[in-house]
Amino acid sequence: MNKQQHFSIEELTPDHPAWREFVALVNDLNQEGWAFNPYFEQFSRYFLAAKQDGSIVGFLMFVVWDIGPHDRDHPPIQIDGKTLREAKILAFGVKDGYRRQGIGTALQEYAIKQAKLFGCYQVRSVSGENHPENHQLKLAMGFAVEPMERDEKCLAFVMPLKSSKEK
């Protein structure tokens, strides 16, 4: 298969004509519990779709929130009185047959670019141990990694976007 296939990344909202196709792919890749969890509706949510030849072949969902209180039971992290924010990737996947073509990397890069525009301090993602392709992708992109445990063993990935000295 030609690895130079063309694809595009776009943000979707529930009123987008391709929303049903997006939801179907999220469900097919078993990410609906993260992508559509009502808890995350209280935050700014972003749904990204990778399209190739008019079809959705990959997705990424992230929220923007304060670092600390929402999933770590920790007070917000502040520097010089300013609360640091992060883009937290909650759901991500690429259809079988479209992997290893740069689609996942492009989705991650788009999320990182948006996080920078939103003034986020970092991008963070947690992934269960059963997703080695995601782990390799994140490590290849330069994310730091740390083992952690929740209901299952998992890995936390963090990509710093700016130092605390940057305003």
Model segments located where?
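Active-site rim helix/loop that mediates acceptor-substrate recognition in acyltransferases
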Residues: L25-Q52, F59-M61, I67-P69, Q78
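Conserved acetyl-CoA-binding loop-helix of GNAT-fold acetyltransferases
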Residues: V94, R100-K113, L139-A140
